[in-house]
Design a protein with these regions (language model features):
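PLD/PLD-like phosphodiesterase catalytic module centered on the HKD motif
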Residues: 1-218
Length: 218
């Protein structure tokens, strides 16, 4: 069907819409690329992508994620194993018994998931990276961009009250192009006030903050 075939609204809000079933899942099922900036990332959140994408592996869908540098200890340890070549090779693709996480490891091994870390490097930014944008692309090069939600959960039971503003390449081309440019500049580490690193580089160089005491509900 493609993204243009979805009956998209300009805004989705928790009191009026089921944001997961009306927006996220239709877009995920009809895209071949998904770019996303989120405040923080958990292994539970990332593993849901292997389920949320309809035919993720078959369609070779690409996922690029940029997140902040704070993690739970358990999440960071498991993400390191999933993204580290030395771990995945030693376990020969059978690192995790959990089915969802095993699927995640498979698509990471296939090169379908890339993860980068954004860390503020300016006195003007006091805390952490918290930009919230997302971009879907389909096979016809149509694009849907959105802003507003901080979570990447596809459970209707665990979401916050939130709203999502939506822009499409066929109705709001200039704004979509601006969001695409913003993401690409972040991805290429060309954005002022933040430095962006590959996940494994950040982990190996002790740039990530983690603690079992942090409460990061996702």
């Amino acid at each position: 069907m493609g993204l243009r075939g979805i009956n998209l609204k300009e805004e989705y809000r928790s009191d009026r819409n089921n944001i997961v079933s009306e927006f996220f899942l239709p877009c995920l099922s009809n895209c071949i690329e998904y770019d996303r900036c989120v405040d923080f990332l958990s292994i539970q959140t990332l593993s849901t992508f292997s389920i949320a994408f309809d035919g993720f592996a078959e369609r070779k869908t690409k996922l690029r994620l940029i997140t902040g540098h704070r993690f739970r200890t358990a999440d960071l340890n498991l993400l390191t194993k999933i993204f580290s070549e030395k771990y995945t090779k030693s376990f020969k693709g059978k690192l995790i018994k959990d089915a969802k996480i095993q699927k995640l490891q498979d698509i990471v091994n296939n090169g379908q998931v890339e993860l980068k870390i954004a860390i503020p490097n300016s006195e003007q930014i006091s805390d952490t990276f918290s930009e919230r944008i997302g971009i879907f692309r389909d096979e016809e090069d149509q694009t849907v961009a959105f802003t507003g939600t901080s979570k990447e959960s596809f459970s209707d039971q665990t979401r916050d009250f939130e709203s999502v503003d939506v822009f499409t390449s066929w109705n709001d081309k200039s704004r979509v192009e601006r969001k695409v440019k913003d993401f690409e500049e972040l991805w290429e580490n060309k954005t002022k006030h933040v430095k962006v690193y590959d996940f494994m580089y950040a982990e190996e160089n002790n740039l990530l903050k983690y603690s079992s005491e942090w409460i990061l509900n996702n």
